[in-house]
């Protein structure tokens, strides 16, 4: 399928609707005068080879019923016409867009015998594009809750948390076995099947405090404190301060686990966690900057009045 070139107006409207990944690579600022030949020297030690080669990212965030109706040729043509040299493609986590073999990894109900992710990765490779696969571990379905209730986030009153926007789903605990075991297996499966350049993890750092059995036991073992309750603690409370540091270290440990798992399969790959608004992140951005050669901020246009320059503003 071949389409005529974009007008400027059409390009702005389409990119706003499609969403974007704002990528900063390398992380350390540099002037345009130093760009080009010095790229390799500017990257942190151990940076993957593709980092300095990508400058225009596209993101395709599929929804569950897309496998039955999306147009592969349209999107590959779109990537060409926008001169994108890298793509972030939704692959798994909440919903799998490929024939996963991992128990409880929910396949799109519209997937059938298709491999939507595989088709997209193959098409992008033919265009000589770098590829990240986007996963999202923040929610799951009733079968997982029934089989593994300890994977579900729990509120301060001890209630398992239903999803705030999708009541058929459950919110998962970011700091327990769902991420450390189940999502590690998902990342490994994706990397083994497609050998992509990396995996971008959306909503990986939790959806507020969790009081599940794993969080209670792990926090107590690490600090000696009981989990602080939001209603009765302040930033000066020793338990609250300990929780902030413990949560951050737990997430950095998770990042390290995922990164090591995919690099064992493809040494030139990386895990790239979503850092959101960066300055608004609850994690220490200095530490994050020392750990990675690339940051990514998943900036979505969820409202009709979102301006097309919002992605660039978020990245800055």
Positions of PLM-derived features:
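Substrate-binding cleft/loops of secretory-pathway carbohydrate-active enzymes
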Residues: 143, 207-210, 251, 255-265, ...
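Glycine-rich, aromatic-flanked loop segments that form ligand/cofactor-binding clefts
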Residues: 57, 85-89, 116-163, 200
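C-terminal segment of N-terminal export signals and the immediately downstream linker at the start
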Residues: 27-54
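N-terminal export signals
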Residues: 4, 10-31
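Aromatic-lined carbohydrate-binding/catalytic grooves of carbohydrate-active enzymes
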Residues: 82-114, 139-151, 215
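Active-site-adjacent "subsite" loops/lids of carbohydrate-active enzymes
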Residues: 137-194, 229-244
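The substrate-binding groove and active-site-proximal loops of carbohydrate-active enzymes
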Residues: 58-69, 100-114, 165-184, 237-252, ...
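N-terminal structural segment of carbohydrate-active enzymes
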Residues: 44-95, 127
């Amino acid at each position: 399928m071949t389409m005529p070139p974009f007008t400027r107006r059409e390009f702005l409207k389409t990119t706003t609707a499609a969403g974007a990944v704002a990528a900063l690579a390398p992380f350390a600022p540099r002037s345009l005068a130093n760009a080009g030949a010095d790229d390799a020297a500017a990257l942190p030690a151990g940076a993957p080879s593709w980092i300095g080669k990508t400058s225009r990212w596209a993101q395709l965030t599929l929804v569950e019923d897309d496998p039955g109706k999306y147009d592969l040729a349209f999107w590959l043509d779109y990537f060409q016409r926008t001169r994108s040299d890298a793509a972030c493609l939704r692959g798994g986590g909440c919903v799998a867009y490929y024939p996963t073999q991992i128990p409880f990894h929910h396949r799109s109900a519209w997937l059938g015998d298709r491999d939507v992710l595989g088709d997209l990765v193959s098409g992008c490779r033919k265009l000589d594009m770098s590829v990240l696969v986007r996963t999202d571990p923040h929610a799951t379905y009733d079968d997982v809750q029934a089989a593994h209730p300890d994977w579900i986030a729990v509120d301060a009153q001890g209630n398992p948390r239903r999803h705030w926007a999708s009541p058929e789903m459950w919110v998962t605990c970011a700091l327990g076995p769902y991420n450390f075991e189940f999502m590690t297996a998902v990342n490994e499966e994706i990397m083994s099947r497609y050998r992509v350049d990396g995996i971008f993890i959306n909503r990986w750092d939790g959806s507020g405090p969790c009081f599940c059995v794993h969080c209670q036991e792990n926090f107590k073992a690490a600090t000696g404190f009981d989990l602080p309750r939001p209603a009765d603690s302040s930033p000066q409370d020793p338990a609250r301060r300990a929780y902030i540091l413990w949560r951050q270290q737990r997430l950095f440990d998770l990042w390290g686990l995922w990164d090591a798992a995919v690099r064992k399969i493809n040494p030139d790959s990386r895990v790239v966690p979503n850092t959101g608004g960066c300055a608004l992140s609850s994690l220490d951005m200095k530490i994050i900057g020392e750990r990675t050669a690339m940051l990514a901020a998943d900036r979505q246009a969820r409202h009709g009045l979102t301006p097309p320059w919002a992605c660039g503003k978020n990245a800055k």
